[in-house]
C-alpha cells in the first residue's frame, strides 16, 4: 500500500501538465468542463430531492457536492460512475424506532479535520461507511442524552450473550442486497487505488462513522417488486370543541329527500314503498333532448377535435350515444304506432303453474320451513333476552320482581298441569339443593308447597313493621340471617308459610354488608309497590313482542291502516290467478308479484311558484340547467288604449297554465300566448278570453312578488316600465280591479260565460263603426281603359334620338342651375361687403386722407334714426341668449360668461386692427421705395405717370380692410364652453 501513492504522484503531475497544455490549445474545453460540472451538480441535487426538507446546513451540502465532483473529475481522467450518486434508503425499524428517528438525530459528531496521511490510511476501511452515510439522512437535534440512548439501542447484541432476538434483515433481503454491497465495495476500492494521491491532498467533507447496526436496518429498494400500499392513518384532531368541529366540518351531501334547512319546502309527506324500489330517480336527460343533441352536435365529430389522444373510454362514449339515439328513435316510432306506453300490458299467466307437481310442493315446503326457521330464531332471541333481563332484575331488586302465582292448598297431590306449573305430593318435603340454589320450604308440619313470593314478602314487611312499632307480634315472622354458614333461613309461627333462598355459593359477603343488602331490597320493594311511570319503563322488556292499535298515535295509525301483514304461507289458493297478493297503498308503490319489507321515506314537497323559486330558471325541453336572468318584455301597446280597454279575466287554471308555460318556454311571450289561446275553430274570441303576449307578461308581473324594474332588459324595457306605472295609477283610481286574482268560474261578474256574449255586442258595434269610417269608391269618375292598339314600338334610331334629346335637356338644366347659383353667390358677397363698409368707420392715416374720407364717407355715416348699442346692451343680449339655450345655468353665471366673451372679442378686434395698420404702412413704404428706384434708373426719360394720391391709396387700403373677413359672432353654446374652460 505504501508503494501505490509514490507511483501515482508523478503520473498525476504529468497528467496535470498535459491538461494545462491542452487547455491552452483548446480554449473551449474549459467551457465544456464547466457545463459538465453544472449538469453533474443538477443530477446530484435531483437524486437527493427526497431530502430537500431535511437539508439545513448549506456549507455541508456544498462540501458534499464538491466531493462528488472530485470523484467524477474528468480533468483527472475519471469517468462518471452512477454508483457515486446517493441512493434512497428505507429504514426497516419498528414504529417506535421510526418515531424516534423522526425527532432525534442519531449521528451528530463534530467535524474533525483529518490529516492527509491519516485519511489516506482510513479511506479504504471507511469507504463503505462513507457511502452509507451519504445515502442516509437524519433530522438534526441538540439532545445528546437522547442521541446516546438511541445509539445504544441500535448497537447489535453480542453473540456471546446469546442469539439475536430478531432475525437479521440481510437473511430476508436475498442475493440482490449482497451483490449490490459487493459491487459498491469494489467501486470504492477502485476509486481509492486510482486517485488515492489526489484525494489525500484535497479536503473532503469529514463524515462521522456509522454504527454497524445501521447496516442491518437499511436495505435498497428493488425496482422489480412494486412498493407496498401505505397504511391509512387517521389524522390528528385539530379542534377539541365540538361547536368548532361542526362549523369547520364539510357538509356531506346526502341523497335523502328531507332537508330541514330547505326554505322552499311546503310540507312533508311519508311514502311507504318496497325496500328494493329506488327512492330517488337518478339524474338523466330526456330522450328528445339527447336525440336533438346527437343529431346537431354528435360526439363522434367533437371528440377528435377536443382531445389530443383518443382512448377506448372516449370512443365508447360516442358509441353509447349512437346506441341511445337508436333506442330513442325506436321508442318514438312505437309511440307513433300506439305500441309504447308507461302502462305495461296485462301480466301473462303461465298455464303450467295451475298444476301442482312434486317440485312445486317441494318449493312450497322449503319456503314454509325457511319462514318457520327465521321467525323461530327471532322468537328464541326475544325469549332469551327476556329471561336474561328477568335474572338481572332479580339480582338487582330481589324477590319483589318475581311473578305472582296462585298458592296451592296442602294435603293434595299436585301434578304437572297443562300450563307448566310444578306440583308435588303432600307429606313429602322438597329436597333442597344448595348448588342449584333451589328454594327450601320448612313449615311446622314439614309440608312442602310452592308459595307466592310476593304474598310472603308482604307478610314479612307487615310483620317487620309491627315488630318495630309495637313489639307485640311474637307470633309473627322472624328472620334470622346466618351469613357465617351462608344459609338464609326464615322461621315463622302459627302455621305461617315461610320461604328461604340459599345464597351460600352466590353471595359470600361479610356480615357488615347485610344491612346494605337489606336496604337495597327494601328500597326496591317499596319503589315497586308504588306503581309509577318510571318504574314501569325500567321494568319494561327491551323488545316489544306485541303491539295494540290503542298504543299508536294518529300518524302511526295512518301509516299502518292499509299495510299488509305477514300471515305466513296461505294454503288456500286465490280464486283469480291474475290478482295481486297485496293492495298498493300509494302511487309510488309498484305492483309487483311478491310481498317484501317496506321502507318509510320522508320527503318534502318543494314549492315551484314564482314567489319562492325564480321563474328565470328554465325547466324546459332543452338546457334545463341554464339560468336566464334577463326579462325581455313583448311589444308594448300605446298608452291611449289604457283607459278604454276591457278587463281580462284570469281564472286560477289560467294562472297555473301560465306559470307552467313560463317554466317550459322561458320568456318567449309569443310562444306562451299561442299555447294559452285555446281556439279550436275560427270562431269569435272575446277580449276576456284573448291572451295576447302583453297580457301574459302583465299577468306574470302581477303574480311575481319579487318583480323589479331592474330585471327588464331590451329596447322595450323603458316603454314597458312606463305602461306598468300608468296602469298601476289608473288601477288605484278605479273601484274595480282590471285583472282580479283567484277568479271563480261561477262568478257572474268575473268568470261567467255571459260576459262572453256581452263582449260580442261590443265587438259588433266596433266592426260597424269601422265599416262606416272606411272610404268608399266614387262611381261618377269614369275609368279610362288602356289603348293597347294605338301603341307603337319605337325603332333603334328613334330610341337613340330620344336619348340624345333627353341628355341635351339635362345638360341645359344643369347649366342653368349653375348660372343661377353663381349670380346668387355674387349678390350675397356684394351685400356683405356693403354691410361691412357701413358698420366700420374709416381710419385716417393723415390730414388729407381724413378730409377725403369725410367727403366720400358721407353716405356710409350712421343715420340719426339708427339705434346705437352700448357695451352693456350687447352683454345683456348675449346673457339672454345663453339663458334661452341653457335654462339650467343661473343668470349670474350667464352674465359673467357674456362679459368675459365681450372682453376677449374686443381685444381680438383691436389686435386685428393694429395688424392691418402695420401692413398698410409697410405697403406704403415699399411703393415709395419702388418709385425712387424707377426715377434713378430713367433720369432722361419722360416724367413718370401721375402718382396716385395718398388719399386714393388710403381709400383702397380701407376698402381692402373692409373687404377682409371679419370675426364671426359665436353661438351662446361656444361662449359658455369658453367660460367654463377658463
Curated annotation (Swiss-Prot):
InterPro entries assigned to the protein according to its UniProt record, in alphabetical order: Homeodomain-like_sf (IPR009057), HSA_dom (IPR014012), SANT/Myb (IPR001005)
Chief location: nucleus
Polar residues: bias regions: 1-18, 842-871
Keyword match Heme: no
Keywords of the record: Activator, Chromatin regulator, DNA damage, DNA repair, Nucleus, Phosphoprotein, Transcription, Transcription regulation
Myb-like domain sequence ranges: 642-704
The keyword DNA repair is assigned to this record: yes
Domain HSA: 346-425
BP GO annotations: chromatin organization; DNA repair; DNA-templated transcription; protein-containing complex assembly
Coiled coil: none
SS bond partners: none
Family the UniProt entry places it in: Belongs to the EAF1 family.
Protein name in UniProt: Chromatin modification-related protein EAF1
Name of the gene: EAF1
Amino acid at each position: 500500500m505504501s508503494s501505490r501513492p509514490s507511483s501515482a504522484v508523478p503520473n498525476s503531475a504529468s497528467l496535470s501538465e498535459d491538461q494545462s497544455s491542452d487547455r491552452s490549445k483548446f480554449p473551449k474545453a474549459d467551457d465544456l468542463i464547466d457545463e459538465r460540472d453544472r449538469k453533474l451538480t443538477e443530477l446530484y441535487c435531483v437524486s437527493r430531492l427526497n431530502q430537500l426538507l431535511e437539508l439545513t446546513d448549506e456549507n455541508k451540502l456544498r462540501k458534499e457536492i464538491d466531493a462528488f465532483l472530485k470523484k467524477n473529475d474528468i480533468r483527472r481522467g475519471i469517468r462518471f460512475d452512477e454508483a457515486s450518486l446517493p441512493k434512497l434508503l428505507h429504514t426497516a425499524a419498528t414504529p417506535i424506532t421510526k418515531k424516534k428517528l423522526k425527532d432525534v438525530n442519531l449521528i451528530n459528531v463534530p467535524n474533525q479535520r483529518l490529516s492527509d496521511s491519516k485519511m489516506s490510511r482510513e479511506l479504504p476501511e471507511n469507504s463503505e461507511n462513507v457511502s452509507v452515510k451519504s445515502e442516509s439522512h437524519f433530522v438534526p437535534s441538540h439532545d445528546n442524552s437522547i442521541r446516546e440512548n438511541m445509539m445504544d439501542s441500535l448497537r447489535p447484541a453480542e453473540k456471546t450473550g446469546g442469539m439475536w432476538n430478531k432475525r437479521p434483515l440481510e437473511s430476508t433481503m436475498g442475493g440482490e442486497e449482497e451483490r449490490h454491497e459487493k459491487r459498491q465495495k469494489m467501486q470504492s476500492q477502485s476509486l481509492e487505488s486510482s486517485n488515492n494521491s489526489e484525494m489525500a491532498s484535497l479536503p473532503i467533507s469529514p463524515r462521522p462513522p456509522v454504527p454497524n447496526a445501521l447496516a442491518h436496518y437499511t436495505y435498497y429498494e428493488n425496482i422489480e417488486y412494486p412498493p407496498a400500499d401505505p397504511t391509512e392513518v387517521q389524522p390528528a384532531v385539530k379542534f377539541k370543541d365540538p361547536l368548532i368541529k361542526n362549523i369547520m366540518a364539510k357538509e356531506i351531501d346526502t341523497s335523502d329527500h328531507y332537508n330541514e334547512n330547505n326554505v322552499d319546502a311546503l310540507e312533508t309527506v311519508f311514502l311507504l314503498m318496497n325496500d328494493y324500489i329506488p327512492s330517488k330517480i337518478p339524474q338523466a336527460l330526456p330522450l328528445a333532448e339527447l336525440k336533438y343533441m346527437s343529431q346537431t352536435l354528435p360526439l363522434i365529430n367533437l371528440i377528435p377535435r377536443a382531445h389530443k389522444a383518443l382512448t377506448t373510454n372516449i370512443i365508447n362514449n360516442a358509441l353509447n350515444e349512437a346506441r341511445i339515439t337508436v333506442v330513442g328513435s325506436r321508442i318514438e316510432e312505437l309511440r307513433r304506432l300506439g305500441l309504447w306506453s308507461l302502462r305495461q300490458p296485462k301480466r301473462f299467466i303461465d298455464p303450467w303453474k295451475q298444476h301442482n307437481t312434486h317440485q312445486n310442493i317441494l318449493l312450497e315446503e322449503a319456503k314454509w320451513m325457511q319462514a318457520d326457521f327465521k321467525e323461530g330464531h327471532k322468537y328464541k332471541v326475544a325469549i332469551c333476552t327476556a329471561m336474561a333481563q328477568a335474572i338481572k332484575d332479580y339480582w338487582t331488586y330481589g324477590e319483589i320482581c318475581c311473578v305472582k302465582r296462585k298458592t296451592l292448598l296442602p294435603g293434595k297431590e299436585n301434578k304437572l298441569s297443562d300450563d307448566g306449573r310444578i306440583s308435588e305430593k303432600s307429606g313429602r318435603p322438597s329436597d333442597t339443593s344448595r348448588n342449584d340454589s333451589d328454594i327450601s320450604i320448612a313449615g311446622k308440619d314439614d309440608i312442602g308447597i310452592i308459595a307466592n313470593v310476593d304474598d310472603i314478602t308482604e307478610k314479612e314487611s307487615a310483620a317487620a313493621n309491627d315488630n318495630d312499632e309495637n313489639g307485640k307480634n311474637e307470633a309473627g315472622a322472624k328472620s334470622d340471617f346466618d351469613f357465617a354458614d351462608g344459609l338464609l333461613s326464615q322461621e315463622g309461627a302459627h302455621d305461617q308459610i315461610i320461604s328461604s333462598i340459599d345464597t351460600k355459593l352466590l353471595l359470600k359477603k361479610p356480615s357488615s354488608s347485610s344491612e346494605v343488602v337489606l336496604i337495597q331490597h327494601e328500597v326496591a320493594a317499596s319503589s315497586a309497590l308504588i306503581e309509577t311511570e318510571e318504574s314501569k319503563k325500567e321494568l319494561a322488556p327491551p323488545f316489544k313482542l306485541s303491539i295494540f292499535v290503542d298504543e299508536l298515535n294518529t300518524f302511526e295509525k295512518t301509516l299502518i291502516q292499509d299495510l299488509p301483514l305477514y300471515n305466513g304461507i296461505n294454503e288456500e289458493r286465490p280464486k283469480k290467478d291474475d290478482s295481486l297478493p297485496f293492495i298498493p297503498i300509494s302511487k309510488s308503490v309498484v305492483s309487483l308479484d311478491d310481498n317484501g319489507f317496506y321502507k318509510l321515506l320522508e320527503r318534502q314537497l318543494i314549492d315551484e311558484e314564482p314567489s319562492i323559486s325564480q321563474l328565470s330558471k328554465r325547466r324546459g325541453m332543452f338546457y334545463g340547467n341554464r339560468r336566464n336572468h334577463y326579462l325581455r318584455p313583448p311589444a308594448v301597446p300605446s298608452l291611449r288604449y289604457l283607459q278604454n280597454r276591457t278587463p281580462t279575466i284570469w281564472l286560477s287554471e289560467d294562472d297555473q297554465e301560465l306559470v307552467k308555460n313560463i317554466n317550459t318556454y322561458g320568456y318567449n311571450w309569443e310562444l306562451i300566448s299561442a299555447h294559452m289561446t285555446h281556439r279550436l275553430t275560427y270562431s269569435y274570441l272575446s277580449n276576456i278570453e284573448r291572451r295576447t303576449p302583453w297580457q301574459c307578461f302583465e299577468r306574470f308581473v302581477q303574480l311575481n312578488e319579487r318583480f323589479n324594474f331592474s330585471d327588464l332588459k331590451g329596447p322595450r324595457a323603458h316603454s314597458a316600465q312606463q305602461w306598468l306605472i300608468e296602469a298601476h295609477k289608473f288601477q288605484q283610481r278605479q273601484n274595480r280591479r282590471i285583472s282580479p286574482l283567484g277568479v271563480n268560474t261561477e262568478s257572474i261578474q268575473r268568470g261567467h260565460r255571459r260576459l262572453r256574449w256581452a263582449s260580442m255586442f261590443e265587438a259588433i258595434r266596433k266592426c260597424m263603426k269601422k265599416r262606416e269610417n272606411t272610404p268608399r269608391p266614387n262611381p261618377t269618375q269614369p275609368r279610362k281603359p288602356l289603348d293597347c292598339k294605338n301603341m307603337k314600338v319605337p325603332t333603334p334610331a328613334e330610341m337613340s334620338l330620344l336619348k340624345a334629346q333627353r341628355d341635351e335637356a339635362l345638360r341645359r338644366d344643369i347649366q342653368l342651375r349653375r348660372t343661377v347659383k353663381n349670380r346668387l353667390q355674387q349678390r350675397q358677397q356684394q351685400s356683405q361687403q356693403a354691410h361691412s363698409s357701413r358698420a366700420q368707420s374709416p381710419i385716417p392715416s393723415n390730414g388729407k386722407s381724413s378730409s377725403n374720407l369725410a367727403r366720400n364717407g358721407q353716405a356710409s355715416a350712421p343715420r340719426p334714426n339708427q339705434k346705437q348699442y352700448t357695451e352693456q346692451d350687447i352683454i345683456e343680449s348675449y346673457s339672454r341668449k345663453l339663458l334661452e339655450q341653457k335654462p339650467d345655468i343661473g343668470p349670474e353665471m350667464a352674465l359673467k360668461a357674456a362679459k368675459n366673451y365681450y372682453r376677449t372679442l374686443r381685444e381680438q378686434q383691436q389686435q386685428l386692427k393694429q395688424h392691418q395698420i402695420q401692413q398698410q404702412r409697410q405697403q406704403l413704404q415699399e411703393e415709395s421705395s419702388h418709385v425712387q428706384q424707377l426715377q434713378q434708373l430713367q433720369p432722361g426719360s419722360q416724367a413718370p405717370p401721375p402718382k396716385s394720391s395718398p388719399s386714393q391709396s388710403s381709400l383702397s387700403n380701407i376698402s381692402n380692410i373692409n373687404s377682409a373677413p371679419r370675426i364671426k359672432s359665436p353661438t351662446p353654446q361656444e361662449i359658455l364652453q369658453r367660460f367654463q374652460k377658463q
